[in-house]
């Protein structure tokens, strides 16, 4: 377990920059992910960890790619129906066979299928403990729910109490440090919808400054006009403690 966790978090900084491109499991070929082999593969070398589905790992990610992989382990839903109605979509045997460093599943606290999503996390944690595979719980939010500190404090703590070793959640401007303080395992932030590059870097800096252990971003990287430059700027914030202003200057210089 600790060995795999050390693949995720840089031993010098204790932090990580994950590149998420698992969106197709419920969104299909969303903007920027139509051709992963063309648009996403050039970004691999600039990430600490990749996050994808086993289908994409097998069919698109080159076998020689020397990066740890977090495998999406929940699915069976789409944007056409209730998003929270997920099932475990990956066996632990396959996760081990594919040499993943962790498995990830959504947890939808307060949603119609809250109970099932928590059971999914428990199932993965139990199976993972037998083979030393960490589980990352990803806090999903229903469309009618308020994205605030109170909600994410509840969701992250429940996921940690169920045994998840890492939590992926959203940054909130008010009270994020309380979310981190109340969660006994590392938190990485999701990027969420596409923002202007300067705003994304500010969000990264604020999250790291308030105790996050890294970022797991997708659209704010691969939908950028200059994704490689954006990856380098995010790395500067997470691992080199650069401010958002300094990181944005780096982004501007790298995009030339």
Curated annotation (Swiss-Prot):
It catalyses: dihydroxyacetone phosphate + acetyl-CoA = 3-hydroxy-2,4-dioxopentyl phosphate + CoA. Signal peptide: none annotated. Its EC number is 2.3.1.245. InterPro entries: Aldolase_TIM, DeoC/FbaB/LacD_aldolase, DeoC/FbaB_aldolase, FbaB-like. Its main location: cytoplasm. The keyword DNA-binding does not apply. It is found in: Cytoplasm. It is an enzyme of class 2 (transferase). Keywords: Cytoplasm, Schiff base, Transferase. Involved in the degradation of phospho-AI-2, thereby terminating induction of the lsr operon and closing the AI-2 signaling cycle. Catalyzes the transfer of an acetyl moiety from 3-hydroxy-5-phosphonooxypentane-2,4-dione to CoA to form glycerone phosphate and acetyl-CoA. Belongs to the DeoC/FbaB aldolase family. The active site is at 168 (schiff-base intermediate with substrate). Homodecamer. Gene3D superfamilies: Aldolase class I (3.20.20.70). This is 3-hydroxy-5-phosphonooxypentane-2,4-dione thiolase. It holds the Pfam family DeoC. PANTHER family: 3-HYDROXY-5-PHOSPHONOOXYPENTANE-2,4-DIONE THIOLASE (PTHR47916:SF1), FRUCTOSE-BISPHOSPHATE ALDOLASE CLASS 1 (PTHR47916). GO terms for cellular component: cytoplasm. It comes from Shigella flexneri. One of its GO terms (molecular function) is transferase activity.
């Amino acid at each position: 377990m600790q060995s795999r966790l050390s693949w995720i978090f840089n031993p010098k900084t204790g932090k990580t920059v994950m590149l998420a491109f698992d969106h197709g499991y419920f969104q299909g070929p969303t903007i920027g992910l139509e051709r992963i082999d063309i648009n996403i593969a050039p970004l691999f070398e600039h990430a600490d960890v990749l996050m994808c589905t086993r289908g994409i790992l097998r069919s698109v990610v080159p076998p020689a790619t020397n990066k740890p992989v977090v495998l999406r382990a929940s699915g069976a839903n789409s944007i056409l129906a209730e998003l929270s109605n997920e099932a475990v979509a990956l066996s632990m045997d396959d996760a081990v066979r594919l040499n993943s460093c962790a498995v990830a599943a959504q947890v939808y606290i307060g949603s119609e299928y809250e109970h099932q999503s928590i059971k999914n996390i428990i199932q993965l944690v139990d199976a993972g403990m037998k083979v030393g595979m960490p589980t990352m719980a990803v806090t999903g939010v229903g469309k009618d729910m308020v994205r605030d500190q109170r909600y994410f404090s509840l969701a992250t703590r429940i996921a940690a109490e169920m045994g998840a070793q890492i939590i992926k959640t959203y940054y909130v401007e008010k009270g994020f440090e309380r979310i981190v303080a109340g969660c006994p395992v590392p938190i990485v932030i999701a990027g969420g919808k596409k923002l202007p590059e300067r705003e994304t870097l500010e969000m990264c800096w604020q999250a790291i400054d308030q105790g996050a252990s890294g970022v797991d971003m997708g659209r704010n990287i691969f939908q950028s006009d200059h994704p490689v430059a954006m990856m380098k700027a995010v790395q500067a914030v997470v691992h080199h403690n650069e401010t958002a202003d300094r990181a944005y200057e780096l982004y501007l210089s790298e995009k030339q």
